[in-house]
Amino acid sequence: MAENGDNEKMAALEAKICHQIEYYFGDFNLPRDKFLKEQIKLDEGWVPLEIMIKFNRLNRLTTDFNVIVEALSKSKAELMEISEDKTKIRRSPSKPLPEVTDEYKNDVKNRSVYIKGFPTDATLDDIKEWLEDKGQVLNIQMRRTLHKAFKGSIFVVFDSIESAKKFVETPGQKYKETDLLILFKDDYFAKKNEERKQNKVEAKLRAKQEQEAKQKLEEDAEMKSLEEKIGCLLKFSGDLDDQTCREDLHILFSNHGEIKWIDFVRGAKEGIILFKEKAKEALGKAKDANNGNLQLRNKEVTWEVLEGEVEKEALKKIIEDQQESLNKWKSKGRRFKGKGKGNKAAQPGSGKGKVQFQGKKTKFASDDEHDEHDENGATGPVKRAREETDKEEPASKQQKTENGAGDQ
């Protein structure tokens, strides 16, 4: 009984060894594996077992050359050859790699499947074990965040379109009682694109609603501000002296009402005063103090407390003028920032007051947003994380590619 148990364990180990090595030299991984491609160029495709056992996943299975050779000799795939001295292995020359054409890439894409619903602490081995009876799998890509955390979703490449279709069309698939979302890779990206479009539409709608709400708040605030100033405007007009200025008005009403704003320019024949309190009261106090004859630079003046629509329009103009004045003041304050001591601007060529920022503009891929991969491994300018599949190389020479070691 013990012998049977040992035989079963050895058979299971040999199967894992074959699977791992045949993955390394397989159609999907080998074209992407820079390190392994360099090795097979050195000796007619032969790679020393001494090199192979430095690959982490194989290393965890065994470092015994005899066990590896025995396992490969029993493989039904007949993908690998063993050297006469049993110290090297290579992919059989009779089984060359497929040419990576557009047709080939489309074929790979058509047998690629998206699966979501795994726990984020699931390992590559957990997922491989779950997929064992689901058809022959050539590659597993564990999708990860920028911080290398597993998202709970994977891309799987099956050996044939038929296998992929059978898997996708199998209803009610679960992982440990958790329902899984299963789609062809193309369907997944089509779904994501549709979601993005919908998100953009919703974002525009939200932005419009927020803008309308903001505008309403501003209008309400403006109306409240107007209401608070109702009855506070005093218009003056007449044949005013050309030297009449706002200071004259401040002096005239200094003890009778606090002035908040004066809409008047020197040389004009009329203007408007905005008081903090009611204009009628300030006007009455000023007249009483001047025996009813309220003049400006000895010129007769007509005084009128504004009401109704005329008052509202005048208030709106004053509020706009106040805001414009505030903006100019802020802008002027910004211009003075960054100058040297004594508010003197840095002299040209001095290098003082200058700050230059240099560097690259970095763009980060967001969650679930940038997984449209070229099936031959080309990724453009974006480097891919090495954790996403079960490909690996010797730890000392690990390449940072998309389909790097799953859980080193």
Curated annotation (Swiss-Prot):
Modified residues (Phosphothreonine): 120, 362
Highest taxon of source: Eukaryota
Gene: SSB
Residue intervals of the HTH La-type RNA-binding domain: 7-99
Protein name as it appears in the record: Lupus La protein
Keyword annotations: Acetylation, Nucleus, Phosphoprotein, RNA-binding, Systemic lupus erythematosus
Segments crossing the lipid bilayer: none
Main location: nucleus
Residues recorded with modification Phosphoserine: 92, 94, 225, 366
